[in-house]
Amino acid sequence: MEPFVVKENIIASASSPMKKRRIDHTESADGSAINASNSSSIGLNNSIGGNDTVMSMAEFGNDNSNNQEIDEDLHSRQLAVYGRETMRKLFASNVLISGMQGLGVEIAKNIILAGVKSVTLHDENVVELWDLSSNFVFTEEDIGKNRALASVHKLQELNNAVAVSTLTGKLTKEQLSDFQVVVFVDISFEKATEIDDYCHSHQPPIAFIKADVRGLFGSLFCDFGPHFTVLDVDGEEPHSGIIASVSNENPGFVSCVDDERLEFEDGNLVVFSEVEGMTELNDGKPRKIKNVKPFSFTLEEDTSSYGQYMKGGIVTQVKQPKVLNFKPLREALKDPGDFLLSDFSKFDRPPLLHLAFQALDRFSSQAGRFPFAGSEEDAQKLVEIAVDINEGLGDARLEDVNSKLLRHLAFGSRAVLNPMAAMFGGIVGQEVVKACSGKFHPIFQFFYFDSVESLPKEPLDASEFRPQNSRYDAQISVFGSTLQKKLEDARVFVVGAGALGCEFLKNLALMGVSCGTQGKLTVTDDDVIEKSNLSRQFLFRDWNIGQAKSTVAATAAAGINSRLNIDALQNRVGPETENVFDDSFWENLTVVVNALDNVTARLYVDSRCVYFQKPLLESGTLGAKCNTQMVIPHLTENYGASRDPPEKQAPMCTVHSFPHNIDHCLTWARSEFEGLLEKTPAEVNAYLSDPVEYMKAMRTAGDAQARDTLGRVVECLEKEKCNSFQDCITWARLRFEDYFANRVKQLCYTFPEDAATSTGAPFWSAPKRFPRPLQFSSTDLSHINFVMAASILRAETFGIPTPEWAKTRAGLAEAVERVIVPDFEPKKDATIVTDEKATTLSTASVDDAAVIDELNAKLVRCRMSLQPEFRMKAIQFEKDDDTNYHMDMIAGLANMRARNYSVPEVDKLKAKFIAGRIIPAIATSTAMATGFVCLEMYKVLDGSHKVEDYRNTFANLALPLFSMAEPVPPKVVKHQDQSWTVWDRWVMRGNPTLRELLDWLKEKGLNAYSISCGSSLLYNSMFSRHKERMNRRVVDLARDVAGVELPAYRRHVDVVVACEDDNDADVDIPLVSVYFA
């Protein structure tokens, strides 16, 4: 999945938990009106009309069981966000979506991918050419077909575990009762209030959602009933702290270790556990806290009569459910309450849009259509209606009805734009999940959004909006034909074809980007499709597993729009592929869209975009959160200008000897797995393939690490070599004894429970936890499971087949009983690292060279006893295959270690999330992020927008929170009468000498004292011998001194120059490109 790096400068809300569609009226080809008002034609009748068609995909063999098991391989990334209980609730939920234009199909896509029980698609109208601007399942061949029927097959392909069916006639109240959630797109307020009244009063209430996209404007209303319980208001894990002390006073004061800052807030409820001395706190009762500081808080409780605190204790936040009392739409229209704000520069916008959408609804009711694009008469009529409604609001009347904004709404009101549909499709899809499960806080109750900044800056003539009998007519009706041509001729580079990449390709295809004769879209991704991708990367199907992501995604995108000129590559973007993505490639691009999943690649692409001065549209997701950053040449800072602080890493001694949470245990477990099963076998093979060169490298290194590596190789080929499966069981059983008994006994011997530090303080003070050795038992399932996984994997490294009996508890227990386990004798001179700053566990002072020679002699003897062709199999950790025993072993290692230290254990799925470093991901936040980005794409390709028109966004669908802000401008460096930013690059032509380059800089008032190329120094004023280079060409110095190999297409060399002004003050200057041809 695509993780983001949160940029602190775009977060405007202090409440942020992180630092850093439809067509109600269409036109024919000649522009005449075709009445399709309220295209879903919703009416609450007591019976179904004779024209109703009901079609279920169950007819095609879909058997959706009520007791469906969660497919953890498919939904692992989503499970990391929602958890099993939420997923089970989704699997039991039936959802209706009425209105299958662009917004409706986006909502359906997202909730089908999420995995509800069933989705029913409702629409009474037919596909028109106009719909192809925003609906990715429609093609030209679908024109004239019922929208729901034209959608069902492709939507069913997204998830065969969801029953997708259709309704094509008028809905009845009885039919609404079949659903837990109903979503209505493109419906009048009159009909919406009638439906919502029924849903609100139904027992149990039916969650009602009304959503609309009108050009660059969108609205959303939620009513989940009179009493809706939110079980998890923010989606975050309960925070906890390790107690250092508790006072006996009124009120009690609690301090925690300074290992990690507390994430509590005043008024939180917490529970205590494992407290020694003041045991009254261990009663499990939630307690309210106040005066929260980074490492302390006060209890709202008198602890003066409690026992005296001795040591230990964990304090954990208790998450409280929240009950929301939703108002029905009829009441909420008159008294909307507080609006959810999206853009803090538009603080007064939501009340105006609340009025505007009501005015638009009245216009549609009176005229039987929505306003025509470019019609000043219709726009003025809309303004008059808004003024009339506003006059009747009494005390709630707005001081100003923004006629300019209403004009924009009128002009685009008939269009469903794909970026708006994608964005709102993600938001509404998440509201459906909330309604089904109580997971995350719903929108309460209205949400309005607009992106009028995306419109072209120059006024457009009415002829710009005229339909062209094109699939882009809806988009043209908002932006005009001139910008549409720019979209079609754009040359775009999409880096990544995962979840974000799939959404981007879909969006760009529908927008017509790179679909013209001059346009081209290049997508690259070096990854292949896995099963876990299918729950978010919606362009892929199960029959694509194992195929290249970029190729499959490109083919699917071309299927959405056959005019898309797309080229799919399987290359990683980095310094090693600059022969593929060369100067000519970058220079010919219009814009770059990142869809990456790692910071290193993001920074490289950012550096290329800065170098070639190309716009970069950056985005990322993490669970329900997303952010976007616009990197625009000369207008904004670049992506690399700001960095998040590095994640805190646990000290090595903590992970290896003093773990105090399950993350430490899993970090250690994965390290041991890779050392035992991947690195050591690989080292064995390296030695056996070329013993002379291998030992030469070891002697050259000659350090403790080389010594330890050789020791493991000798151990693997000598006393721990396995020749039968029983040997593998013996190895696994002895590993258990070593890890979970002997090492702990040695640690307790070296540092007994009453040990003290050199200052006299208790050694085993928080956060350290005193461990207990485990006694192996063949009746303990977790013990046997560990031995099973370890022995099977050990056998795999030696090429030994696994007998079937070894996969049974009884058979394995019998074999384990035959293993002789030596008695443990503690070492009096054992050294255990306790320094948190230590980077290695090797502390003994020995003659490494002598030990390496001794180990080499042993290896020579081992090699003589082996068959010449003998090699081990190095096992690479693969988290997403539940049949390979990898996670069984890692979870077993971690949980047994957790048991040693009385740390709560976790199941295999949770272990997979942590040890596999799985990035939580859901389709809704991904879709929303790409919608935000593509709204910025209009601005980029228009080419005339200022920095204040662009928006960086941070959003968290769990809260929900939307925080949009103007990007930060680039840092400006000034020198004399000149100024420059990171976007500038100085160019010197004429194949200059070093002297000529220095004189050229001198003319700018700069004294260069150092010139480097790559990692080599071409010139330094302090080195007298460098003055001998004055008459040499800079390019020749680059070749001869820096060893630069210039490809045939390259006509310049880049040098970094360090300069001072005449006052000896350093001046940072841009990169200098010296052209030699």
UniProtKB/Swiss-Prot annotation:
Catalytic residues identified in the record: 653 (glycyl thioester intermediate)
Region (Disordered): 16-36
Listed GO CC annotations: nucleus
Enzyme class of the recorded protein, top EC level: ligase
Entry keyword set: ATP-binding, Ligase, Nucleotide-binding, Ubl conjugation pathway
E.C. code: 6.2.1.45
Entry superkingdom: Eukaryota
Pfam families, alphabetized: E1_4HB, E1_FCCH, E1_UFD, ThiF, UBA_E1_SCCH
Residues the record lists as binding ATP: 499, 525, 536, 549, 597-598
Disruption phenotype: No visible phenotype and no changes in disease susceptibility.
Tissue: Expressed in leaves, flowers, roots and stems. Detected in germinating seeds, cotyledons, hypocotyls, vascular tissues, anthers, filaments, pollen, style, stigma, sepals, petals, ovary, developing ovules, funiculi and silique walls.
Note: Both UBA1 and UBA2 are able to activate ubiquitin and transfer it to the E2s with equal efficiency.
Function: Activates ubiquitin by first adenylating its C-terminal glycine residue with ATP, and thereafter linking this residue to the side chain of a cysteine residue in E1, yielding a ubiquitin-E1 thioester and free AMP.
This protein's name: Ubiquitin-activating enzyme E1 2
